[in-house]
Structure formats: structure tokens, C-alpha cells
Amino acid sequence: RKAIANAKENFWTKGQMAEMALDAYFQQGRTVIGGLGELRGNGQFVRREALKRCGGWNEETITDDLDLTFRLHLDNWDIENVFDPAVEEEGVVSAIALWHQRNRWAEGGYQRYLDYWDLILKNRMGSRKTWDLLVFLLSQYILPTAAVPDLLMAIARHRLPILSPMTGLTITMSMAGMFAGLVRIRKQKGLNLSSYFMLLLQTVRGTLYMLHWLIVISSTTARMSVRPKRLKWVKTVHTGSN
């Protein structure tokens, strides 16, 4: 599990802290039911044998952990996610830095589908992992991409968005998962009534923060649909603990 080392710094880092709790909760849930566990950057351990069989690290991607995730599963390896201990990562502290980082994540996440779609459709991962993958493709990429034009059309025509039931369900599941993840992390320090109220506020704030993904995914989809693969990587600035 990734944890944000500077989580208390500002709104953006607090949002990233809640986001990592949500991601850890979902990732563990996916692996428990035999779904597709994913690598998450720093703190990951990869067997040398597995890396050799998959052809090593891919130099033609900007998110090597996401790319390797697919190649490992296509080669019938499993990825386990450990909730404890957490590996700390310095969160970005500004909207601009967040924009560059999340665009890189979104583009790399998209690119792996484009690179391996034929093998995925051949069910090389197995039925359970393939269905799990398609469900998260729908919720992480397709639905956010469709939600933005749907909302704009709803405003222009003075009607409710067509996708509002699916969007509402996705947001509800996200909030529930985020709260459950935060509770599980907080249990290490003990819980009382005020703790639950604080975690609820963190969940609401984290959900508002997560709305940036709608813009990121939509813009990335539009860009990748008309531009060739470009592998643009903007370095994330880290300052350390001073």
C-alpha cells in the first residue's frame, strides 16, 4: 500500500492520502476474488524469473508498473497487494504538478490497453481476470470520458444527465471504499466516535478531490484519439523533508 508522507500539507496532499486508501481497499478486494492485482510504483517486489519471462522492463511506456502489470498477468503470474506495512511517497503539492502526474498515469494506463488488447480479448489472463479488467476499464476510463459531454449536454438542454444513475453508483461505491480504506488504516491507532466523524469528513473531501479525474481522463482520451503515441514525461518535483 502506498501512503502519502506529506499528507497534512494541503488540500491536494490530503486528497491523495484518501485516494491511496481507496486504491488499496479496491486492490485488495480485487485480488481476494481472483481479479487483477496491480503494481503500484515504489515498494513493489518483482520476481526475477517473472521479469525475465515477461521480457524485462518496457522502455516504450511512461508507466512501467502499469505496463508490467498486464504482461505479468498475460504470462499467468499473480500480483498480491499488502495493506501493511505501507510504503511512503511524497505527494505533489500543487494543482499543476498534480495535473502533469495524473496525465502521465492516465496516458500510461490507456496505452497498455492499446498495446495488449489483442491478447486480452484472447482471454490469456483467464475469464475472471479479464472480466475484472473490463469492469475497471468501464469505471476508470469509459464512464468518466462519457460523463463530461453528458453533463454539458444536460446543461445545454436543461435535463438530467443520461448517465446519472451509473455516475451516482460509481461515486457511491468510491465513497464507501474510501471510507472503508481510511477506517482500516486508522484502526492501527485506535477508533472512537470522533474518529469516525473525522474519517467521514476526509472521505467527503477526498471525493471532491477525485473529481479532477473526470477532466484528466476526458482530456487524455481526446488527446490520444488524435495524436500518436508520444511518451511525454514531466518530472515530478520532490523536496524531501527539508
Please provide the spans of the model-predicted regions:
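Active-site-adjacent helix/loop segment of glycosyltransferases
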Residues: 99-141, 149
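Membrane-proximal soluble regions of multi-pass membrane proteins
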Residues: 101, 105-114, 195-240
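Long helical/loop segments within the catalytic core of UDP-sugar-dependent glycosyltransferases
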Residues: 1-62, 99, 103-114
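Catalytic donor-sugar/metal-binding loop of nucleotide-sugar-dependent glycosyltransferases
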Residues: 34, 60, 69-88
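Short, hydrophobic alpha-helical packing/hinge segments within bilobed ligand-binding/sensory domains
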Residues: 68-69, 98
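Transmembrane helical bundle of ABC transporter permease
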Residues: 17, 93-97, 194, 198
